[in-house]
Amino acid sequence: MSTDQYRRVVVITGLSGAGKSTILRALEDAGYETVDNPPLPLVHDLVARGEGPLAFAVDARSRGFTADGLALAMERMRQLPGVRADLVFVRADTAALLSRYTETRHRHPLASGVGVRDGIRAEEILTASLVDVADLVVDTTDLPVTRLRAMIAERYGPEETGQGMVVSLISFAYPKGLPREADLVLDARFLRNPHYDPTLKPRTGQDRDVAAYIEADPDYATFHDRIDALLRLLLPRFVQEGKKYATIAIGCTGGRHRSVHLVEKLGEELRAQGWSVLRTHRELGISDDAPQAGAARVSTDDRNGRPEEHGSAQAPDELSRTTS
């Protein structure tokens, strides 16, 4: 259905500090009229009387907020003629939320008279039932702002400028944890490691000499070819299932050499096949600002992390001091 046949309405809810304001700003940049924290009883009327795409952030701050009340409001909005309403639930783990509140010294809306941790727990309980009814659940624990904004723009931006499904490629270090948003995780730790070559150790997988060293592994070509075959099978099927975003994470020990090279290599090849690609090197603190589009794809049948030593990725958090 084209954008002139329905009105987009996006309601953002979830945990305070998880990134609702970042998503709201991304939607505003995509042409939505946005309202932050309206009283829940007024949301239906605002949609019924409004024109054009609308986005709301509704959470524990909103007067009259309950999980059941928001679920009922979503049902009523979806019954309005010509309206397509989505519920987006944003969350992050407790450690990430505590870190963001400590950094900004903002007050948690449910922490009156108790600690921030207790406020976070109370909000998790208050909103838990909404996770199951949300159209999109986003965990921003390790998600950089650039990737969060690109994800939202690709899913909810104007269809005439959309690029179809975005393939997100992430390199990471296993000791620092798996990317939570990954649909598929690949392990490159068996490949020869440039870390043990004194001339290559300080470089990264973006370096030609490092790439040549890795590709000289006797099993590299087989590994690469099987990944390519797997993605040629999976990605078109993801599109058939209606996915707008597919995240593939490739890990190694340090997240600097082998995984970085494979993300760079696969990114180039996927763009050549016509996919829209977003690359993130979590441990290097590097991320594309927007998906890099490839050439028109030949149709198939049916058609954040937190780096420690190399710069920091901005937290996708309405509490962040900087703007994205």
UniProtKB/Swiss-Prot annotation:
InterPro entries: P-loop_NTPase, RapZ-like, RapZ-like_N, RapZ_C. Residues 299-311 have a biased composition (Basic and acidic residues). The lineage of its organism: Bacteria, Pseudomonadati, Pseudomonadota, Alphaproteobacteria, Acetobacterales. Keywords: ATP-binding, GTP-binding, Nucleotide-binding. Belongs to the RapZ-like family. Transmembrane segments: none annotated. PANTHER family: RNASE ADAPTER PROTEIN RAPZ. It comes from the Bacteria. ATP binds at residues 14-21. It comes from Granulibacter bethesdensis (strain ATCC BAA-1260 / CGDNIH1). Residues 286-324 are annotated as: Disordered. This is Nucleotide-binding protein GbCGDNIH1_0395. Pfam families: PapZ_C, RapZ-like_N. Displays ATPase and GTPase activities. One of its GO terms (molecular function) is ATP binding. GTP binds at residues 59-62.
